[in-house]
Swiss-Prot record:
CDD domains the UniProt entry points to: RRM1_HuR, RRM2_HuR, RRM3_HuR
Record keywords, A-Z: Acetylation, Cytoplasm, Isopeptide bond, Methylation, Nucleus, Phosphoprotein, Repeat, RNA-binding, Ubl conjugation
GO biological process, one term: negative regulation of miRNA-mediated gene silencing
Protein name, UniProt field: ELAV-like protein 1
Crosslinked positions (Glycyl lysine isopeptide (Lys-Gly) (interchain with G-Cter in SUMO2)): 191
Domain RRM: 20-98, 106-186, 244-322
Gene: Elavl1
Pfam families: RRM_1
Main location: cytoplasm
One of the record's GO molecular function terms: protein homodimerization activity
SMART domains: RRM
Length: 326
């Protein structure tokens, strides 16, 4: 099972044969389908616009598809609207790709990179293997330097395989240690769950402000007993159509949704936040939930924020299991 928008691409884009169909990522959660159509109609005639929503709850998942009548208008929409700032989001506009086995599982996890390498450096290094759909270098928010970890999604799995064969164990210029290049984890495959543990144990200062680092002994492992007891698949983190749900425990009474947006937003696309409140006092009961569209971004948010201090509270952050928290 793929994560993010690729599941929907199978049903929404399978008949697309031209370059008129676009996918729009990182939309504001309160943006409507009509507003999506209106925005893209300013470029040219839109044949269809579809905002993808949670099939049960009905809320926006933060992305949609726009199909133009002409390929020229679609190309102009990408050059005009890609990177547009909408509310607190910067939208990404690109061609939608029909789902097929050829393009599945083409996402790489790279670690051990020199801290001086930028996103452009990483793309330049890997572009010889094929077309890069997107890339992300994880940056320490305090120092502004790379954390030596990156994700790259190729157009085809064969391109990703070639990159692994050529670069796994390779020493890039400026590095005294070999880098690790492998397929990014699919959390529905137990053999790949070690990635979360790797992310969790890595240096994890990602969020500035009132969050302060705590000693490792205070950290609550997202791979703890409650999660590992479900290794058969019952309680391991899995993604429903709504994305990857993260459980945050030990929030202060005054915590609100704005704090969660501020904390998790820097890691990637957040589609929903919820603080659980006491019915009588309307104060936070100490926990909340955040839903993110991308597994790697959710895993990194957990690795960075679990065990950190918010106010006078030490947060416990983990993937939500199938067990209900009351």
């Amino acid at each position: 099972m793929s994560n993010g928008y690729e599941d929907h691409m199978a049903e929404d884009c399978r008949d697309d044969i031209g370059r008129t169909n676009l996918i729009v990522n990182y939309l504001p959660q309160n943006m409507t389908q009509e507003e999506l159509r209106s925005l893209f109609s300013s470029i040219g005639e839109v044949e269809s616009a579809k905002l993808i929503r949670d099939k049960v709850a009905g809320h926006s998942l933060g992305y949609g598809f726009v199909n133009y009548v002409t390929a020229k208008d679609a190309e102009r929409a990408i050059s005009t609207l890609n990177g547009l700032r909408l509310q607190s989001k910067t939208i990404k506009v690109s061609y939608a790709r029909p789902s097929s086995e050829v393009i599945k599982d083409a996402n790489l996890y790279i670690s051990g990179l020199p801290r001086t390498m930028t996103q452009k450096d990483v793309e330049d290094m890997f572009s010889r293997f094929g077309r890069i759909i997107n890339s992300r270098v994880l940056v320490d928010q305090t120092t502004g330097l790379s954390r030596g970890v990156a994700f790259i999604r190729f157009d085809k799995r064969s391109e990703a395989e070639e990159a692994i064969t050529s670069f796994n164990g390779h020493k890039p210029p400026g590095s005294s240690e070999p880098i690790t290049v492998k397929f990014a984890a699919n959390p529905n495959q137990n053999k790949n769950m070690a990635l979360l543990s790797q992310l969790y144990h890595s240096p994890a200062r990602r969020f500035g402000g009132p969050v302060h680092h705590q000693a490792q002994r205070f950290r609550f492992s997202p791979m703890g007993v409650d999660h590992m007891s479900g290794i058969s698949g019952v309680n391991v983190p899995g993604n429903a159509s709504s994305g990857w749900c993260i459980f945050i425990y030990n929030l202060g009474q005054d915590a609100d949704e704005g704090i969660l947006w501020q904390m998790f937003g820097p890691f990637g696309a957040v589609t929903n936040v919820k603080v659980i409140r006491d019915f009588n006092t309307n104060k936070c009961k100490g926990f909340g939930f955040v839903t993110m569209t991308n597994y790697e971004e959710a895993a990194m948010a957990i690795a960075s924020l679990n065990g950190y201090r918010l106010g006078d509270k030490i947060l416990q952050v983990s993937f939500k299991t199938n067990k209900s928290h009351k």
